[in-house]
Amino acid sequence: NPTTYTVEDEITLIKPTKRGYNANWDNGGKISKGSIGDKTFNANWTAIVYKISYNLNGGTINGENPTTYTVEDEITLTNTPTKRGYKATWDNGGKIAKGSIGDKTFNANWEAVVYKISYNLNGGAIDGENPTTYTIEDEITLINPTKRGYDFANWDNDGKIAKGSIGDKTFSAMYTPVVYKITY
């Protein structure tokens, strides 16, 4: 942009640029032919509004997170999506740093919650090993324990964890005494 003009000049100033902002000159940034006197132009900066979108990847969200931001904002998402049996994290830790520009999309990333499995063998023992944890994605059938002098009857809770199950589980082994013959 020029730094001087004469009464014969007609000037339209080029808009200044600044990352994350739109600008306009006051007075329209123009000097008309025939103008006289010193001129001062001030740039009027307006932060560009960018869109924020969300991909919940099968989850749901209670509450709202921001849908727009500007270069002046620092955003931390406070509402995390939920999905049965999973915990979520957002891309980028759910943050937009001050000074960022451009539309943003946050994806929900899902990790299966790990639940505990506890056992009460009631004096029995297992030949092998039953799992001590599971997730909503697992399907488990327990190994039955043995107990000297007893037949294994059943596990409470059927000794199975169906795919889609959630929550910590405790299984107790049930036995029936072996009936022995006495011969005389």
For the regions a protein language model found, what residue spans apply to each?
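Secondary-structure capping and domain/repeat boundary segments
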Residues: 1-184
